[in-house]
Swiss-Prot record:
Chain ranges of the SUEL-type lectin domain: 67-159, 168-260
Pro residues: compositionally biased ranges: 7-16
Transmembrane parts of this sequence: 323-343
Biased composition (Acidic residues): 368-383
Sequence ranges on the Extracellular membrane side: 49-322
Principal place of residence: membrane
One protein family per Pfam: SUEL_Lectin
GO CC term, one of those recorded: plasma membrane
Protein name per UniProt: Protein eva-1 homolog C
Length: 441
């Protein structure tokens, strides 16, 4: 025997969804997915450009590293760049590699310095992307302080593979110039002469050096003189760069530099922003030759890239604010587009209504009058063909009418007056003829 269970409630009928409603809901979902895709793509582009900004920062900064005796000194630069050694020191320092400093060796720390350190590091690491150098006293020549703890300190830059190079002979003027919003950054400079380079600044009475005589202190001189400026000039002589070669040897200065955007260089070295802009020079100085037929507007190379990098760096630092501004701008754009569509539709509707109202105000008799006038004009044109030919043949300056033509003209005028009178009667106006109608009689 079956016991009666709890009565089941009938299923509630679900409202039938109209297909038109579904079409109205789908576009916002598509817009939302499109917005998500745009945000993902923009975030990838932002991270890529921020990495590029970090890459430029690594190229502009001075890197310093050290290693103690028995260790390896590792120098590394990013892709598409090489090592440019700025300075090197090998000697004693008990604070770096030793916890205790014996009292008997306090005065020896000043004399325990290897003079060949810089040249050795140049030979091993210059223009290399990576360098691994074993720190040992035998690598840098005779040990001046046997038994003491020493270390190697190297300062270097990562110079891009594509840089500007300039060579100026002795007793000539070096001129460096960057365009607006860019500043000079000196990567390397040498003053002297190499034995293999015979074609640079050569002359018949020149005395060639028996060995390479180069002064690397030219880098410090040019950095103090030209770093962070748009224009720089200096006379290449022994007074500024010393005399590394024997008397009678013709020397030259070789400079490797780059023009860096202001925003990036200022972010690395804030002191650049406090520098006063250089005074305007006369035409022809610093290698600037203005063409009268050309544009006098200064070039803006690199401004777009530098401003974009600064903008993306700000967006990466403030993602919430950037997202809020982006969503707000999208909403404002959609609102303006909607307003434009509404105004366009309403104006089009008003124009159609106005046109229909004008068509209703025009009476049907006017159309009849226009048709009759068109027919009369056609008749006049057809009838006036032959008289026109006669008048052209006889060369008369006044019209000639016969009795038949006068009768037809009077009949046409009378018929026109009847049509006009009928039009006035249909429109409910006064049926009396105007005064000027009597002039036709």
């Amino acid at each position: 025997m079956l016991l009666p269970g709890p009565a089941r409630q009938p299923p509630t009928p679900q409202p039938v969804q109209h297909p038109g409603l579904r079409r109205q809901v789908e576009p916002p979902g598509q817009l939302l997915r499109l917005f998500y895709c745009t945000v993902l793509v923009c975030s990838k582009e932002i991270s890529a450009l921020t990495d590029f900004s970090g890459y430029l920062t690594k190229l502009l900064q001075n890197h310093t590293t050290y290693a103690c005796d028995g260790d390896y000194l590792n120098l590394q630069c990013p892709r598409h760049s090489t090592i440019s050694v700025q300075s090197a020191f090998y000697g004693q320092d008990y604070q770096m590699c030793s916890s205790q400093k014996p009292a008997s060796q306090r005065e020896d720390s000043l004399t325990c310095v290897a003079a060949t350190t810089f040249q050795k590091v140049l030979d091993e690491c210059q223009n290399q992307r990576a360098c691994h150098l074993l720190v040992n006293s035998r690598v840098f020549g005779p040990d001046l302080c046997p038994g003491s703890s020493k270390y190697l300190l190297v300062s270097f830059k990562c110079q891009p593979n594509e840089l500007k190079n300039k060579t100026v002979c002795e007793d000539q003027e070096l001129k460096l110039h960057c365009h607006e919003s860019k500043f000079l950054n000196i990567y390397s400079a040498t003053y002297g002469r190499r034995t293999q380079e015979r074609d640079i600044c050569s002359s018949e009475a020149e005395r060639l050096p028996p060995f390479d005589c180069l002064s690397y202190s030219a880098l410090q001189v040019l950095s103090r003189r030209c770093y962070g400026k748009q224009r720089c000039k200096i006379i290449v002589n022994n007074h500024h760069f010393g005399s590394p070669c024997l008397p009678g040897v013709k020397k030259y200065l070789t400079v490797t530099y780059a023009c860096v955007p202001k925003n990036i260089l200022t972010a690395i070295d804030p002191a650049i922003a406090n520098l006063k802009p250089s005074l305007k020079q006369k035409d022809g100085e610093y290698g600037i030759n203005f063409d009268p037929s050309g544009s006098k507007v200064p070039r803006k190379d690199g401004i777009l890239v530098s401003n974009s990098l600064a903008a993306f760096a700000y967006i990466r630092a403030h993602p919430e604010r950037a997202a809020l501004l982006f969503v707000s701008s999208v909403c404002i754009g959609l609102a303006l587009t909607l307003c434009a569509l509404v105004i366009r539709e309403s104006c089009a509707k008003d124009f159609r209504d106005l046109q229909l109202g004008r068509e209703q105000l025009v009476p049907g008799s006017d159309k009849v009058e226009e048709d009759s006038e068109d027919e009369e004009e056609e008749e006049d044109s057809s009838e006036s063909d032959f008289p026109g030919e006669l008048s052209g043949f006889c060369r008369t300056s006044y019209p000639v009418y016969s009795s038949i033509e006068a009768a037809e003209l009077a009949e046409r005028i009378e018929r026109r007056e009847q049509i006009i009178q009928e039009i006035w009667m249909n429109s409910g106006l006064d049926t009396s003829l105007p005064r000027n109608m009597g002039q036709f009689y």
